[in-house]
Amino acid sequence: MATGEYRMGATETFDDLNMQFVWNFDKFRPNSLGQGGTPYAILDAGSFFRAMKNCWDNGCSVSNFAGGALSTDFPKHVIGIRDVHLPDWSLSNSQFGLKLEGDYQGVGFSLNALTYRSQLPSLRAVVDNADNPFTPEIESQSYDYLIAFDMYFPRVNLIGGSLDFYVDDIKSVFRVEAAYTDGEEFANTLRPELYSESDVFRYVIGWDRPTFIPFLNEKRAFLISAQLFGEYLVDHERETVNGIEAGNPNWEINHVGTLLVKGWYQNDRVSPQVIMAHDFKAHASVIAPSIDWLISDNLRLTVGANVKVGDGEQEFDDCRACNPFPPFTGDGEPGDTALRNLAGYEPLGRFRSGPIGMAQAEDEFQITLRYRF
């Protein structure tokens, strides 16, 4: 990785101004999403990928596939994940970023541009050598709406900016960040290739304030920090058919709010805090209280917990009824929405529930004791 910085300092207009450049030419490494049983594996994606790869390599059974009545045994090379296309280690796959930041009359700002490879995978149903298991011949061809995938890591372009400013009248710091991307890919059960591209607008509004809470501590202020994260899928597609929803499982517009309240006691050696987060569309929340106690210069004890509450898992069209092999899997054409009558938690329902909603049964209690030599 190479970085460069040009510090212009104070100018006629700005109190401070500088520019940064980043060129990441390292070998591409995707995010590690964990394996089955791995703690904190987001949305349990690793288990799903492993199961789907096994389906392609060795065959598997899928319940309620053909017409929603019977389970179906698939031989190898019909459904699942066929291949993973990691970007080559080349200059054309490098990642570039540019940032202009400065200060104007007490307002900090930044403008950012970045082109990069998504470290989260996209599943594209573009397999061209699948076989129809209901015929004796080996067709080795592509089929629309078939849950057979290749995994890709698309290139994403991002532009964004941020503002930081202090409001003295209310003793608060505010942060506003926004970013617009193109090139991101999302699951889409209304498309023959089962994915689509969408521009995405994301934003964050943050507020920090030291606040005295006399009945808790008359001598030391608490830190109160709140943030609101927003996401808008510009090219969102969704339809409701036969009582279930199909298309993009991600919410078109969603918000996640967080709140931190942190205090200090005994000359800052004891610090309790509580963190809360709420996913508005998933109707899911997490509450995480903890206390940190510096017993001595060498010994520290941290006790914490997190408790999740909410509606739990949500269902979404999983394309089991997408009719990829007519007339064996149903009447009509492949992808006929009139046939859509099956939805499930796995895998696309997870995108509706989000990380908090899918962790409703994962309350935790933690004790950490550290000794420093």
Which residue stretches match the model-derived regions?
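Aromatic- and glycine-enriched pocket-lining scaffold segments that form the walls
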Residues: 1-118
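Outer-membrane beta-barrel "beta-signal"
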Residues: 2, 323-373
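Residues on the lipid-exposed face of transmembrane beta-strands in outer-membrane beta-barrel proteins
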Residues: 2-6, 10-12, 98-102, 111, ...
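Outer-membrane beta-barrel translocator domains and adjoining extracellular loop/strand segments
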Residues: 32-38, 81, 122-128, 186-193, ...
